[in-house]
Design a protein with these regions (language model features):
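Conserved alpha/beta-hydrolase
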Residues: 47-68
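Conserved acidic catalytic loop of the alpha/beta-hydrolase fold
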Residues: 78-94
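Flexible "cap/lid" loop of the alpha/beta hydrolase fold
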Residues: 115, 119-150, 192-199
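Short beta-strand/loop motif that positions the catalytic acidic residue
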Residues: 211, 217-219
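Conserved alpha/beta-hydrolase "acid-adjacent" motif
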Residues: 224-230
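Catalytic histidine-centered segment of alpha/beta-hydrolase-like enzymes
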Residues: 248-260
Length: 274
């Protein structure tokens, strides 16, 4: 367990490779209602096999971290502080891999000039926030919009399993793995829904590759939440291309080809850090 500046104990796991490649440590940042558990060992193993030391953590109020009783008080800035407390304890700037909410936190770190070796954005929140996505969903998929509102207010365990399967896993049926995933989820701070809208910008206004870390973007072309146009918006800001995962859902770590995705990430990081 690590501690943040409020002395809350944070769940923090370190996975060591059999042989180190010399790459900086990789710190995985999870999405909403999740925790360190959301990155399956099968997704991490290709990175370990390539010689990377990998960290997973849970923000305050998530997973095994303290602060669950105040989950409705926490803001995006609190989760950023938790991540910074982990990064500051490392001996050198790390590689940050952020999924969904974690990608928003990673972009805040870039904006705030936090020392980083590289950043990987998975199923990325657009630089301008989720307001455009929320409006699109309100008009094109009002049931999904309603269910997301329920997740942030009534609680994630009141969300329709069928809607969760469709939005997160691009599935039409509620399978056992979807049920297992949802059973592990925790409630989320309603403030986060506001913080992620983008009224206060989460990303740098302009990306300067000369003084900012290299950015890698990975997104599924069948993501029902972060559409291809949203991922492309991120790529335009960070002056890069999207690595499209064919048939990939929002939860890339759980797709059939998840290990191929993490293997590609490891190879790509070696290239951008050469």
């Amino acid at each position: 367990m690590a501690k943040n500046e409020h002395t809350l104990k944070l769940e923090h796991h370190v996975f060591e490779p059999q042989r180190h490649s010399g790459l900086p440590d990789i710190v995985m940042l999870h999405g909403i209602c999740a925790g360190a558990w959301v990155f399956p060992k099968a997704f991490l193993e290709p990175l370990l096999d390539q010689g990377c030391r990998v960290h997973t953590l849970s923000y305050r109020g998530h997973g095994e971290s303290e602060g669950r009783g105040r989950i409705h008080d926490w803001r995006l800035s609190d989760y950023v502080s938790d991540v910074v407390s982990i990064l500051n304890a490392l001996s050198e700037p790390a590689i940050v891999v952020g999924h969904s909410l974690g990608s928003a936190i990673a972009q805040v770190l870039i904006r705030d000039a936090c020392p980083l070796a590289a950043v990987v954005l998975l199923s990325p929140v657009p630089p301008k926030g989720l307001s455009t996505i929320a409006l699109r969903m309100l008009w094109s998929d009002p049931i999904a919009y309603q269910q997301l509102a329920i997740a942030f207010t009534v609680g994630v365990h009141q969300v329709s399993g069928r809607v969760a399967a469709r939005l997160l896993f691009s599935k039409t049926d509620v399978t056992d793995d979807v049920r297992q995933f949802m059973s592990q989820c925790c409630d989320e701070s309603p403030w986060l829904a506001l913080d992620l809208q983008g009224f206060s910008r989460i990303a740098p206004l302009k990306y300067d590759p000369r003084r900012m870390p290299p950015v890698v973007i990975v997104s599924g072309d069948d993501d029902r939440l972060i559409r291809p146009s949203d991922a492309t918006e991120s790529a335009q800001l960070y002056q890069t291309d999207v690595h499209w995962v064919g048939g990939g859902s929002h939860m890339l770590m759980y797709d059939q080809g998840a290990n191929s995705v993490s293997q590609w990430i490891g190879h790509q990081l070696k290239q951008v850090l050469q």
